[in-house]
Amino acid sequence: MLFFYIRHGDPIYTPDSLTPQGELQAAALAKRLALYGIDRIYVSSSVRAQQTAAPTAKLLGLEPETLDWATEHLTWKDFALKSPDHKKEHWVFQSAYFIRRFNSPEIRALGANWTSAPEFADTRFAEGIARIQKETDAFFASLGYVRDPVSGTYRVERPSGERIAFFAHQGFGLAFLSCILNDPYPHFCTHFDFGHSSMTVIEFREYDRENVDPVCVPRVLQFSNDSHLYREGLPTKFENRIFF
């Protein structure tokens, strides 16, 4: 199974929608995904994600399935906080204070148990990660891939050659992919990021299926790929901040 995680196009947050640039990005992305096809489309309930998915769905004749648990505002409640360097609530992965704390020896040493740190006792980190992990596990189990909570590998109950596209967000995506890849959130959210309309491709490949004890591990084949923008002559400007 190939899993495509796609961040929405260039957004207007209020009212929730895409900019004209975001609409062009979504159209370019649809052409890229149509090249080899997509079998199913899942999408956050936010308008900007829905509008990003729409051109792909139309081009391929697919009906997207909306997943309310992937909407950004739920993740914001769990992972946006005030800190000494921000008077207003802010994503923790964009806060110098939390970036330092997340990468401290104490937090790194806790690994998957990082939410047990006393300094996070008054946050919603534990609830947020537990919620997203539960929904993520249920989602992939519905596709035939069941996660082992100890090893982070997957048992394949129904082998699939499907190509699955999931259109959602940056903040949600950092928590979501950390759950898929068994990489603690403090490390993942401070070392990886998604551009507008970017495509991350993960292969759920099963190894040694003919043997008694096969294993499936999700492997990232591409991360935050925006080649569709280059192909269509659109600006490849990450977060409207830097060209590369």
Show where each model-derived region lies.
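Active-site-proximal alpha-helix that buttresses catalytic centers in soluble enzyme cores
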Residues: 1-71
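Non-transmembrane alpha-helical segments in soluble domains
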Residues: 30, 57, 133, 137-140, ...
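Phosphate-handling substructures
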Residues: 61-145
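Aromatic-acidic/polar surface patches that form glycan- and anion
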Residues: 18, 42-45, 125, 129, ...
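Beta-strand elements within well-structured catalytic alpha/beta cores of enzymes
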Residues: 2-6, 42, 159-168, 172
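Acidic, low-complexity terminal tails and accessory targeting/binding regions
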Residues: 73-93, 146, 150-163, 174-244
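Active-site metal-binding loops of divalent metal-dependent hydrolases
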Residues: 9, 170, 224-226
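A structural signal for well-ordered alpha-helical segments within the folded catalytic domains
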Residues: 27, 47-51, 130, 134, ...
